[in-house]
A protein has these predicted regions:
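Conserved acetyl-CoA-binding loop-helix of GNAT-fold acetyltransferases
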Residues: 70, 75-89, 103, 107, ...
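C-terminal "cap" of GNAT-fold acetyltransferases
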Residues: 122-147
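Conserved active-site alpha-helix within GNAT-family acetyltransferase domains
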Residues: 100-126
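Conserved GNAT acetyl-CoA-binding A-motif
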Residues: 89-101
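Extended, folded domain segments that form the structural surfaces/walls around functional sites
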Residues: 67-68, 96
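A short, well-structured alpha-helix characteristic of acyl/acetyltransferase catalytic modules
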Residues: 1-19, 140-147
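Acetyl-CoA-dependent GNAT
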Residues: 8-67, 73
Length: 147
């Protein structure tokens, strides 16, 4: 099913990701193999009136990637919260990396009771927070933090 919609999902993310989604994250989704389940990996979409209004994609609970985008006309209506909630409920936990100047995403994460547990310099050179939701464990990403 992913192959049928992959190009549309990527186009949506490029268009509505407000230029905050990394090329690495988009390549991850583009290259995500089909045919078998990947532990901690899920994609969910939000649809309103038969129109795609939001996407979330998480790889390895967010340790590999966690990307979300919502169409501007659907923002501040709970779409992003529903998508994050779906992923946390389905996977049991979720991690995200958010640059400290991305106030919209930080507001979303903190409104979902995500916990900031580490800060590092992200790929854009900006201070970036690691956040966890649900049954998150710092040890799960310890090797990444200490690199």
């Amino acid at each position: 099913m992913l192959d049928k919609y992959r190009s549309r999902l990527l186009l949506f993310l490029r268009k509505y990701g407000d230029q905050r989604l990394t090329h690495k994250a988009l390549r991850w989704l583009r290259d995500l193999p089909l045919g078998r389940e990947h532990l901690g990996t899920a994609i969910a979409v939000a649809v309103h009136n038969k129109q795609l209004v939001g996407i979330i994609a998480v790889g390895k609970y967010g340790v590999d990637e966690a990307i979300i985008a919502v169409k501007p006309t659907a923002r501040n209506k709970g779409v992003a919260k529903q998508l994050v909630s779906f992923i946390v409920n389905r996977l049991g936990r979720m991690y995200a990396r958010v640059a400290v100047d991305n106030t919209a995403s930080l507001n979303l994460c903190f409104s979902m009771n995500m916990v900031a547990f580490d800060m590092f310099t992200g790929v854009t050179g900006k201070p970036t927070l690691w956040l966890g939701a649900g049954d998150w464990r710092r040890e799960e990403i310890e090797g990444i933090i200490n690199k």
